Structures are given as structure tokens and as C-alpha cells.
């Protein structure tokens, strides 16, 4: 993907930390975490072009809203800087450095049995497994399991199925399924 999901997750996390009083918002969209906190979000894709777009962090506003940031709360525009407005009133926005500093985007094939990194607290893999047969699903779910620290969670969508259920403890909450690493 081109970064929208990973950036939205980071914005949501930063916004929540401010609301909880853990982080401080000095100016609009510029959030500072406590010195002993680390927030790092890794977005991966198999496409070099998708990774390039994600790293640029620049998105065009269309009639239906800001690029493919769907159902995006207007208050979250504070995490963007307006970088261009053309003659057709099309706006180009770039995600602020205060969000981008928590991001990393790397090439990675989900079918690689080795994870790109280890000791994650949470892995999100939503709406990807539904396009694969059971054996590729098992490879991916095992790699995601290896990438999690003990007690970490894997988040799938409701349409994804767990190919290796004995690796996780399942926890269903509303429209979300969390799998805690055993």
C-alpha cells in the first residue's frame, strides 16, 4: 500500500496519547512523546512504487476527500501541511514531520517466511489473507508470529481467517479480531 493505513494508525495513536495526557501537542499536529517512549510504525509492500509514494507522504485531495484516506476525521488534517493548490482548486497535502519521524517503509514480500523485523507489539495484516490459499496463509501467519514479541497481538480483518490457530489466543471485540501470541 502507499502509506495511508500506516500513517492513519500513527495519527490515531498520537491523537489518543494526547487525549490520555501521555503526549503533548505543542502546536497543531506537532506532538511530542515522553523521552522514554518510542513509537515506530513499519509499513511494507512488495511494490517499489508503493514504497516510494509512502515515503514521499504527499497526497492529493479529490472531491470525495483526501486521496484514499477514507472516512478521515477532519480534525486529523492538523497532521498535514498544505503544499500546493493548483488552478483547478486541487490541493496537495504532505504529512507533517512530527508524524513521519515515527514511520519507516520497506520492501517486503509477505510470502517471505522471515519477518522484516522482530519484537513488534502489534502486527496489522488486514484484508490480505483472503486473497490467498491456505498454505500461503500459513507461511504469512507464522512469519507474523515470529515478528511479534511474547504477548504481542496480530490484528486481522473479520474476513481474514486464522490459518494457524494454535499459535495465538483469539480475542474478538466488536468489528476487530485480535490474536495474542502464545
Model-identified regions with their sequence ranges:
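Short, well-ordered alpha-helices that flank and scaffold nucleotide-derived cofactor binding pockets
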Residues: 11-18, 56, 146
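A short glycine-rich, Lys/Arg-flanked "PGG" loop and its adjoining helix->strand segment in the class I
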Residues: 138-150
